[in-house]
Amino acid sequence: KPKYYNPESVLQKSGHGSYVETPLGEVYLVHLCARPFAPELRCTLGRETAIQKMKWTEEGWLRMYDDDNLAKEYVEESKLPEYPVPQIPDFDDFDGDELGNWYYAPRIMPQRFADVKARPGNVRIRGQESRTSLNKVSILARKLTSVYAKVTTKMEFKPETHQHSAGLIMYYDNMNYINLRKYYSQTLGQSALSIIHLENGTKTELLNTRIPVADGPIYLRLNIEG
């Protein structure tokens, strides 16, 4: 909400923290936050995680290390030895025994509908309810950490009725998304590609982008440029 926006801080909505104390006695707070874009103040990247260096005062109060009250983008690192962790891969050919833990789905575990064992080298996604549902939706997603990205996927899908669709989606929530989808077009009498844009629950189908397509493998790409 605009009345809670502080233009002096890049990180907004900071809260819901987890307390961390290292073996060296260093104190940190890991917390949720968001980075809204001006002037709309919309948090396009959703909830993010930040870390702050903290300290205990002589009176027993937990305070930020620099005695400020604004969340910082950059903090002093711990003096503990580095502990490397695997980086999230830019490419996934789904040839492992299980789905990577960097995948998410709205409100349910993605393993409930996404299977990497049925056809090695592919992920098979079982359809469920519509994209606007608050219950069971088959959206296999990765979190964006930047507003500049290129996302590409190869898909095999043959829709048989107008209720069948699959594709590539840029998803904020069930009322806000952009979906490049393959579906069965009753108008064309065959499979087609089109783009659906949902903003605050209002749906716009960009019919000028609709094109007929064959039912073989197809590549879909999404370019995000700020």
Name these PLM-found stretches.
Residues 1-226:
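Carbohydrate-active catalytic/glycan-binding domains of CAZyme proteins
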